[in-house]
Amino acid sequence: MASGGGGGGGMEAVEVRFRLDDGSDIGPSMHDQATTVTALKEFVLARWPQGKEIAPRTVNDVTIINAGQVLENNRTLAESRNLAAESPEGPITMHVVVRRSRPERRVKQPPKARPPERIGCGCTIL
């Protein structure tokens, strides 16, 4: 098995391919159906190709999509599968989206009060 995730439970392993945004793949690789989505993200993160322009730094930067549905971190592979969308032959293709964590936003300071504009003329008569 390529990754664990909490007990075998006698479930059959599943072959999964992770498709990246540029069309390249990680895998296919075998995963236990009890593997959590978080463990799948860790698997992808550990095998991310070097030299890619966009690369995740943490598991939170990775989103996995299967059959058009964003997979939740606490769910297992078995709970996240869509049997109607899967081919009986070959691996399940899951799409990987990288979304960088946004840095914490600084609280905007209210604009400083401007000094009142002078009203009047600055002309000198000779």
UniProtKB/Swiss-Prot annotation:
The modification Cysteine methyl ester is found at residue 123. It comes from the Eukaryota. It is a lipid-anchor. GO terms for cellular component: plasma membrane. It is found in: Cell membrane. Residues 124-126 form a propeptide. PANTHER family: MEMBRANE-ANCHORED UBIQUITIN-FOLD PROTEIN 2, UBIQUITIN-LIKE PROTEIN 3 HCG-1 PROTEIN. Residues 14-79 form the Ubiquitin-like domain. This is Membrane-anchored ubiquitin-fold protein 2. May serve as docking site to facilitate the association of other proteins to the plasma membrane. Keywords: Cell membrane, Lipoprotein, Membrane, Methylation, Prenylation.
